[in-house]
Each structure stands twice: as structure tokens, then as C-alpha cells.
């Protein structure tokens, strides 16, 4: 089923379809990677789904098989009658579009107790940021370094453009209020303007040294840009997410920590996609790169990957 981000797409799609068809749902235990160290979330973050895991060999099941036809959203066409006749349906694919499950998002999130997990992470790791404006940024490198024809590494320009976009959007939002709104919300606006900004970046341990150097280049690029709010940039703090904790954060905890931030700059990664999607801040600004796949996967249509409220930024 892949890593956490890929699994979440498959999980949410499966449960959403079961709600639509008014059936139960199961996950094959041998496909969940429950015994792997990298999949600790099945005993923590996703532990509620253990009761829906089965030891049955899916090869011996007589269920209707539905295979994803292409990368873009394509409504899953399986009739309830066919599901009843064959005893169930097997889904094969990535299903990487919010449209597969967006209508059932709240119900599914309640089922896996998402809010409880987010609150635990927030209390443990986010306290120091409560009085700041926080932008999370995910840098995806790792195995991408060896498969850039499929998954390109997003360059510094994207992160510079995204920070500029977020800051200008905030300023335009404040300046665009009418007189009555400004009067009623004066205190709120004042607090927004005086809050310090924190750029909280996330990466794998093996990439930290390289990302640390890239952060310095990003800071320099912002300072040299004539369109940047220089005072804001000079006062912006750049920190590695979860780096100051005594205990190493699991990957699912880092994902949820990103979701607690005010705004999100995601990489071309299903992992940080979910961090932004889980963010329940009504005023969040989400930036995603215009290049999601490399030339070898240029046939993958990503038009339905991200919600329309998110912002495609040049990378």
C-alpha cells in the first residue's frame, strides 16, 4: 500500500465507498505492513482500523475487482447489487484525489479519531508556536534523488515563491477589509500583524544537512527579492519541525504537527498533501508545486489532486 500518504488515500477512499454503498470494509493485514518499523502508525495513529483488518488471503476471495483506470479522478462505478452478489469489492489503485472522499471526510476522520491524535500532538509539540504565525514547509528528497525522472526534487525557487505568496495574501486580506470590518476586527488585525512568523520545515534525517544549507539560500533569496516584506523576513524564525524534542517524532506525528500550523507549503508528496488536508484552519493558505511528476510520468493528470482552494506555485 506504500507509505503513510499513499495509504491514507486508499483508506479514505475505501471507507467513503463503503459509506456510499452502506457496507462494511476490511483491509488485508498482509498488505498493511504492520510488522515493519516504518509503519508504527498502525499501532498508534491508525490503531482504530485494526478491527477492520483481516488475515484472509485476498487471492482466494471472490469479490468484484475494481482497478483504477488512470491517475486523475474517475468515479468508482460498482453497483450495490454486484457487491451483494459477489460478497464484496476489491479496490486496486492509488486514488489520489480528494474527490473520492471529500464528502465523507468528517465521518471518516471521526472514525479514526483524527482530532484526538491531532490534539495529542498539538499539546506535546506545538505549545511554543501558539502565539506565532507558523508556515510549515515539507522538503521531500530521500529516494527522489534516484528517481527524478518520475519524482523531481522541488527547488528553492518554489519555497521562496510560496513564502512571498502567503505573506502578500495576508497583507492583501488585511488591506482589503472595509472600514466597518477594520473597526470591529481591529484588535484581531493588530494581533495578526504583531505576531512573529516561524518557518517550520520538515525533512528526513538523512537530508537534514543538505536542507539546512538550502534554508540559508532561501533566506538569502527572500532578502534580495524586491517584492518581499523585508521586515517580516528579517524577523522570521526558521526552525526544523520537531528537532528540539528529546524524543524523536514518528512520521505520523510530524504530519499532524504540520497540520496544526497556520499555513502549509507542501512538496510533491502525498505525505505533506495530507498534512495540508488535515489542517482545519479556515484561513489556511496552502501552496503546492506546479510540477508534481517528472517526464517519465507526464501522462499522470493531476488536475483533481488538490482542492480548488489550494494555490499552485511555480517551481
Segment roles from a protein language model:
Residues 1-9:
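A short, glycine/small-residue-rich beta-strand->loop->alpha-helix junction that serves as a flexible
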Residues 4, 197-297:
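Donor-binding and catalytic core of enzymes assembling or modifying cell-surface/extracellular glycoconjugates
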Residues 6, 33-40, 100, 144-147, ...:
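Short catalytic/ligand-binding loop motif for oxyanion handling, primarily in non-cytosolic enzymes
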Residues 10-17:
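Short amphipathic alpha-helix
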Residues 23-33:
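A short beta-strand-loop structural module common to alpha/beta enzyme folds
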Residues 181-182, 186-187, 191-192:
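Cationic, low-complexity basic patches in intrinsically disordered or flexible, solvent-exposed regions
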Residues 295-315:
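Leloir-type glycosyltransferase catalytic cores
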Amino acid at each position: 500500500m506504500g507509505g503513510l500518504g499513499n495509504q491514507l488515500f486508499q483508506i479514505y477512499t475505501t471507507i467513503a465507498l463503503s459509506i456510499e454503498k452502506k457496507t462494511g470494509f476490511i483491509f488485508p493485514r498482509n498488505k498493511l505492513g504492520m510488522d515493519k518499523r516504518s509503519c508504527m502508525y498502525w499501532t498508534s495513529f491508525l490503531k482504530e482500523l485494526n478491527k477492520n483488518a483481516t488475515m484472509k488471503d485476498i487471492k482466494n476471495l471472490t469479490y468484484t475487482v475494481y482497478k483504477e483506470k488512470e491517475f486523475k479522478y474517475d468515479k468508482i462505478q460498482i453497483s450495490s447489487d454486484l457487491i451483494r452478489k459477489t460478497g464484496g469489492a476489491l479496490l486496486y489503485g492509488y486514488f489520489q484525489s480528494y474527490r473520492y472522499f471529500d464528502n465523507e471526510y468528517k465521518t471518516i476522520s471521526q472514525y479514526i479519531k483524527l482530532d484526538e491524535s491531532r490534539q495529542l500532538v498539538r499539546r506535546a509539540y506545538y505549545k511554543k508556536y501558539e502565539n506565532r504565525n507558523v508556515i510549515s514547509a515539507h522538503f521531500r528528497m530521500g529516494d527522489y534523488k534516484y528517481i527524478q525522472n518520475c519524482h523531481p526534487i522541488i527547488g528553492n525557487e518554489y519555497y521562496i515563491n510560496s513564502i512571498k505568496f502567503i505573506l502578500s495574501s495576508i497583507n492583501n486580506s488585511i488591506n482589503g477589509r472595509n472600514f466597518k470590518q477594520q473597526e470591529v476586527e481591529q484588535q484581531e488585525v493588530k494581533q495578526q500583524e504583531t505576531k512573529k512568523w516561524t518557518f517550520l520545515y520538515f525533512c528526513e534525517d538523512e537530508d537534514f544537512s543538505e536542507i539546512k544549507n538550502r534554508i540559508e539560500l532561501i533566506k538569502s533569496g527572500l532578502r534580495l527579492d524586491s517584492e518581499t516584506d523585508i521586515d517580516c523576513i528579517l524577523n522570521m524564525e526558521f526552525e526544523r519541525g520537531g528537532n528540539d524534542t528529546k524524543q524523536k517524532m514518528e512520521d505520523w506525528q510530524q504530519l499532524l504537527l504540520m497540520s496544526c500550523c497556520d499555513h502549509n507549503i507542501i512538496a510533491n508528496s502525498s505525505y505533506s498533501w495530507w498534512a495540508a488536508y488535515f489542517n482545519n484552519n479556515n484561513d489556511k493558505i496552502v501552496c503546492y508545486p506546479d510540477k508534481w511528476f517528472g517526464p517519465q510520468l507526464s501522462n499522470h493528470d493531476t488536475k483533481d489532486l488538490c482542492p480548488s482552494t489550494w494555490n499552485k506555485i511555480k517551481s
